[in-house]
Amino acid sequence: MKDKLVKAIAKDGQVRIIGAITTELVNEGVRLHNCAPTAAAALGRMLTAGALMGTTLKSEKDTLTLQIHGGGIAKGVVITSYADGHVKGYIGNPTADIEPNSKGKLDVSGIIGKNGNLLVIRDMGLKEPYIGQVPIYTGEIGEDLAYYYTVSEQTPSAVGLGVLVDKDLSIKSAGGFIIQMMPGADEMLADLISYRLEEIPSITEMISKGMTIEEILEYIFEDMDLKILESIVPEYRCDCSREKVERALASIGQKDLKEIYDEGKEEELKCHFCNKAYVFSHDEVGDILENYYSEK
């Protein structure tokens, strides 16, 4: 099933929905970072959440950064997403892996930890970015995001995120949804949706059966006048470049850069998001020193 993200409404706009299949996207992120199974599930859930949330941005220049740091062996997960549905991200410890939880599922909460915060940073080109922050609720990520929306944005929400890791460590299925009740929505409608969400199979199970994201949402919102508003293809895409990495190297400061130059060695930097290595020769480090720090 090809990746697809859709925006929709139900019950005459009382409910706002963003849903997506993200199997290929998550596969690419997990491949780039060579993740162990539990780390793959954690990174995949965050990538899916980022793709969903990024599409709420108003401008193509805006960015949304999602961070969760709970003190666990995952050492945090960071995602950056954009309005067109493309995302990039990394997990601090890609080898993080522990025994399944009591339900026999990959223990994402166990590697994330619960002693920390979930941050949502929206950079809309203003002087300061908007930063929303809540304590980690469960460490399972979906429930933490629902808690964030309810507490920080006063929008009652249900967030479902799923990643099914196959025996060969590839991603068999991945996807998710954000369902939000709009101001003035019928409380009984919210109760009905909550009941349905408890009764349906997991999103990874539905994707594995070959259901499209539209069919999954039609199944959840049967008899609720679901209307698909738009669809896009989400993807994992890193926009790193030699120029950006050069600026990052220059930003460490003249003193530290001079120390690197004086060692007479080449300097290698890796992109956090895609692991691509950029090598700067001794002469190139000297050029950076001259270009950024020589007195004009």
Swiss-Prot record:
Modifications after synthesis and translation: Under oxidizing conditions two disulfide bonds are formed involving the reactive cysteines. Under reducing conditions zinc is bound to the reactive cysteines and the protein is inactive.
Organism: Clostridium botulinum (strain Hall / ATCC 3502 / NCTC 13319 / Type A)
Gene Ontology biological-process annotations: protein refolding
GO CC terms: cytoplasm
Entries under HAMAP family matching the protein: HslO
Domain of life: Bacteria
Statement: the UniProt record of this protein carries the keyword ATP-binding: no
Molecular function via GO: protein folding chaperone; unfolded protein binding
Family assignment from sequence similarity: Belongs to the HSP33 family.
Keywords, ordered alphabetically: Chaperone, Cytoplasm, Disulfide bond, Redox-active center, Zinc
Name the record gives this protein: 33 kDa chaperonin
PANTHER family: 33 KDA CHAPERONIN
Positions of disulphide bridges: C238-C240, C271-C274
Residues passing through the membrane, by range: none
Localization in the cell: Cytoplasm
Cited function: Redox regulated molecular chaperone. Protects both thermally unfolding and oxidatively damaged proteins from irreversible aggregation. Plays an important role in the bacterial defense system toward oxidative stress.
